[in-house]
Amino acid sequence: MFTVEERDQARNRILEMAQADRRLVAGALIGSTATGSDRWSDLDLTFGVADQMDVGDVLADWTARLQHEFQAVHLFDVSSQSTVYRVFLLPGNLQVDLSFTPRAEFGARGPNFTLVFGNAVKKHEISQPSPEHLFGLAVHHLVRARVCIERNRLWQAEYWISAARDYALSLACHHRGLNTSYGRGFDDLPQEVLDSFADTLVSTLDREGLLQALARTTQGLLRNSQDVHDLASKLEGRLQELNSIAA
């Protein structure tokens, strides 16, 4: 695994390359790179692309440069509005996330943003999903899980139950003002909340084990639905139907 020194060297070199690239008019640290990373944090950097320059062309060139200089491997891309995020894996399993945005739209999308060079425009921060959205996704996933159990699609049922549990935990995070994204707030939940979800893990990949995990996940969702009381009240009866043994 990568060392802190290797990560710092990669960060400094990438920033050096960016500041020497006339196509990039601004750069910033984002995520944990901006707030103070721990031993295992990855690198998150974002850049503003000059007018008249094509973001795709710049991204392709930077990909080739990182592959040559760092032996980086391109894993996947994520697009959000005009920004493209490209995720790389370097030797030592160091993850490097680079994003590129046209200059006119370059700015902070969240609280973790430290400008290194150039200028940034003021933007509205992207808000976390609403509790109604989280609850609705969890309900959808629980219904799909029960259908998969009846179809004897056991691995797919496990997939939906696990996903529903994640949204139930995200609701618990939302209620306490914790981060709801990618499980980042889960470990900050009170221990009694986490303990109450222990039985939601699928213990055996058979009908009985899946139905038990489904029932426990449903209970966990309803127990943590304080922020969507009216919606939960409308759906509680239907959710309990999912837990009947007979199809």
Model region roles, listed by residue range:
Residues 63-65, 118, 173-174:
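Juxtamembrane helix-loop transition sites at the ends of transmembrane segments
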Residues 1-22, 30-40, 47-98:
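Metal-dependent nucleotidyltransferase catalytic core
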Residues 39-41, 109-111, 186:
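Short aromatic-enriched loop/helix-cap "lid" or pocket-rim segments at secondary-structure transitions
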Residues 104-133:
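A short, charged helix-loop
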Residues 122-247:
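Conserved nucleotidyltransferase catalytic core and NTase-mimicking acidic/glycine-rich helix/loop elements
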Residues 94-101, 107-109:
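Short, positively charged
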